[in-house]
From Swiss-Prot:
<protein>
    <recommendedName>
        <fullName>Large ribosomal subunit protein bL34</fullName>
    </recommendedName>
</protein>
<keyword id="KW-0689">Ribosomal protein</keyword>
<dbReference type="GO" id="GO:1990904">
    <property type="term" value="C:ribonucleoprotein complex"/>
</dbReference>
<keyword id="KW-0687">Ribonucleoprotein</keyword>
<dbReference type="GO" id="GO:0003735">
    <property type="term" value="F:structural constituent of ribosome"/>
</dbReference>
<feature type="compositionally biased region" description="Basic residues">
    <location>
        <begin position="1"/>
        <end position="15"/>
    </location>
</feature>
<dbReference type="InterPro" id="IPR000271">
    <property type="entry name" value="Ribosomal_bL34"/>
</dbReference>
<dbReference type="Pfam" id="PF00468">
    <property type="entry name" value="Ribosomal_L34"/>
</dbReference>
<dbReference type="GO" id="GO:0006412">
    <property type="term" value="P:translation"/>
</dbReference>
<comment type="similarity">
    <text>Belongs to the bacterial ribosomal protein bL34 family.</text>
</comment>
<dbReference type="GO" id="GO:0005840">
    <property type="term" value="C:ribosome"/>
</dbReference>
<feature type="compositionally biased region" description="Basic residues">
    <location>
        <begin position="22"/>
        <end position="45"/>
    </location>
</feature>
<feature type="region of interest" description="Disordered">
    <location>
        <begin position="1"/>
        <end position="45"/>
    </location>
</feature>
Length: 45
């Protein structure tokens, strides 16, 4: 059984990259939450 998903990096960045998060109000909320928590990476590289 494979655990990891094999999405292409382009798809991954479009779906959950920093710019994708900044586009929506909900996405900005996610970033703010992750900043508040003190995450080293707030969005995927």
């Amino acid at each position: 059984m494979k655990a990891k998903s094999h999405l292409s990096n382009k798809k991954r960045k479009r779906a959950s990259g920093f710019l994708a998060r900044m586009k929506t109000k909900a996405g900005r909320k996610i970033l703010a939450r992750r900043r508040a928590k003190g995450r080293k990476r707030i969005a995927i590289k």
